[in-house]
From Swiss-Prot:
Its main location: secreted. Homodimer. Interacts with ALK. Interacts with LRP1; promotes neuronal survival. Interacts with LRP2. Interacts with NCAM1. Interacts (via C-terminal) with PTPRZ1 (via chondroitin sulfate chains); this interaction is inhibited by PTN; this interaction promotes neuronal migration. Interacts with NCL; this interaction promotes NCL clustering and lateral movements of this complex into lipid rafts leading to MDK internalization. Interacts with LRP6 and LRP8: this interaction is calcium dependent. Interacts with ITGA4. Interacts with ITGA6. Interacts with ITGB1. Expressed in various tumor cell lines. In insulinoma tissue predominantly expressed in precancerous lesions. This is Midkine. GO terms for cellular component: cell projection; extracellular region. The lineage of its organism: Eukaryota, Metazoa, Chordata, Craniata, Vertebrata. Induction: By heparin and retinoic acid. Disulfide bonds join C37-C61, C45-C70, C52-C74, C84-C116, C94-C126. It comes from the Eukaryota. One of its GO terms (molecular function) is chondroitin sulfate binding. Belongs to the pleiotrophin family. The record marks R103 as: Required for high affinity binding to PTRZ1 by interacting with the chondroitin sulfate chains of PTRZ1. The keyword Disulfide bond applies.
Amino acid sequence: MQHRGFLLLTLLALLALTSAVAKKKDKVKKGGPGSECAEWAWGPCTPSSKDCGVGFREGTCGAQTQRIRCRVPCNWKKEFGADCKYKFENWGACDGGTGTKVRQGTLKKARYNAQCQETIRVTKPCTPKTKAKAKAKKGKGKD
């Protein structure tokens, strides 16, 4: 008799566990990409600490809200955002008056419906010619 009771209890526990797993899968499917909502509006990726690294992006569609993991590269340019991808030309010649080089970038891809400029211009300081350093390295190897 005890054997039958133990077997019945085990069968009920297994049935309850299977039912709970099925309900959990249904909940995941309802909020995921297969939901009725087609036009998600995604916000920017907000890093969890400092200004780069792993973080979260919030999306809304009607009354639904979702948070997904994302990553902001640590070498991103804050002026035009991490979700705007550009194809850049080569650096231009050094402008002696300002001491900077300029290049232009054309928008290649806007991720997560980001508002991006079609073209951007970026500058960087000109690097001084380093011929003296190159000669010094050659001389060090010879004894």
